[in-house]
Curated annotation (Swiss-Prot):
GO terms for biological process: cytoplasmic translational initiation; formation of cytoplasmic translation initiation complex. GO terms for molecular function: RNA binding; translation initiation factor activity. Pfam families: EIF3I. It comes from Candida albicans (strain SC5314 / ATCC MYA-2876). It comes from the Eukaryota. The gene is TIF34. WD repeats lie at residues 8-49, 51-89, 91-135, 149-188, 198-240, 296-335. Component of the eukaryotic translation initiation factor 3 (eIF-3) complex, which is involved in protein synthesis of a specialized repertoire of mRNAs and, together with other initiation factors, stimulates binding of mRNA and methionyl-tRNAi to the 40S ribosome. The eIF-3 complex specifically targets and initiates translation of a subset of mRNAs involved in cell proliferation. This is Eukaryotic translation initiation factor 3 subunit I. Belongs to the eIF-3 subunit I family.
């Protein structure tokens, strides 16, 4: 599984994201420009320049018409993908930690960090996607959810499959479900800080099932990832690692999840990647067991994204590199012992 290595950022990666078709890969880092790449060959299509500092998050709408970025410069920017033009900028009261389009692309959520005296919020903006009036967006959000009432600031967020709920991860290990129309808290769950004795339980990533977004995975500094059902809001699976996890993703087609993380650079005594545990880890989604690792980064993995058709994945690291992997035949053919037995029984060979 030889990757394409993309060198387009001067500093650590913060998020990578595929568009719905998977032909484009979007990336942001702790520098001030986002990049758009062809995922098939790693050629850079262009850059989105306009932020004045670190860009924490990026997302693209279902039509690959618009993309949004949020950064430490207190700005949320809306871009036209076709020409890389910034069509609108919303001001934020504090650094923007996460942006995410609703499944229909009509709304955009943004997390404003709980710093500088600002109460942490999740704001929802209505998106006008008419080409003729892209610059005429509503300046004020249609909904503001204050997350302070949960006793902890929001770190990550995303939408349920029907767009009815906003799922928010917090730095105290809790996950909350809010009604996306009223902003009311529906329920919350402690997803991290209960599986081991780790003190840092901050949730670092949330990604949804690619098929229908009916369940999602969270990663945490507590060295675990959890799979949670959107409707019942119960923990389905727990994946235990040996280092703080920064990111987690669910693969389509095959029943796997991918975790990424590693010890923070300042805590690693040698530069060996095995020492810092800087590999992408593959777990069986059902059986919760680790089945393999992929090396390559020379620092913690900060973000992973899986190709929508399940043919590969991309990872972005603290080392400033993006690695685009295409799965080989051994990945596609891999079966757990229980799966192999079940398949043989179905075929009548045992």
């Amino acid at each position: 599984m030889r990757p394409i290595k993309l060198m387009g950022h001067e500093r650590s990666l913060t998020q990578v994201k595929y568009n719905r078709e998977g032909d484009l890969l979007f990336s942001v880092a702790k520098d001030n420009a986002a990049s758009i790449w062809y995922s098939s060959n790693g050629e850079r299509l262009g850059t989105l320049e306009g932020h004045q500092g670190v860009i924490w998050s990026i997302d693209v709408d279902p039509e690959t018409h618009l993309c949004a970025t949020g950064g430490g410069d207190l700005a949320i920017k809306l871009w036209k993908v076709e020409n890389g033009q910034c069509v609108y900028t919303w001001d934020s009261p504090s650094p923007v930690r996460r942006v995410a389009f609703s499944p229909d692309g009509k709304k955009l959520l943004a997390i404003a960090d709980q710093v500088m005296g600002h109460i942490g919020t999740v704001s929802v903006f209505d998106i006008n996607d008419d080409d003729a009036t892209l610059s005429q967006q509503k300046a004020e959000p249609s909904l503001v959810i204050e997350t302070k009432s949960e006793g902890s600031k929001a770190t990550v967020a995303g939408w349920s499959g029907d767009g009815d709920y906003i799922i928010v991860g917090h730095d105290n290990g809790y996950v909350s479900k809010y009604d996306s129309k009223t902003g009311k808290l529906v329920t919350s769950l402690q997803a991290h800080g209960i599986h081991n004795e780790e003190k840092n339980v901050s949730i670092t990533d949330i990604q949804f099932a690619p098929e229908d977004r009916s369940y999602f995975i969270t990663s945490s500094k507590d060295k675990t990832a959890t799979l949670i059902d959107v409707d019942t809001f119960e923990i389905l699976k727990v994946y235990k690692a040996d280092a703080p996890m920064n990111t987690a993703a669910i693969t389509p087609v095959k029943d796997f999840v991918i975790l990424g993380g590693g010890q923070e650079a300042r805590n690693v005594t040698t530069t060996a990647e095995s020492q810092g545990k800087f590999e992408a880890r593959f777990y069986h989604k059902i059986f919760e067991e680790e089945i393999g690792r992929v090396k390559g980064h020379f620092g913690p993995l900060n973000t992973v994204a899986v190709h929508p058709d399940g043919t590969g994945y991309s990872s972005g690291g603290e080392d400033g590199f993006i690695r685009v992997h295409t799965f080989d035949k051994s990945y596609q053919d891999f079966l757990f012992d229980a799966e192999r037995t079940e398949r043989a029984a179905a075929a009548g060979t045992i």
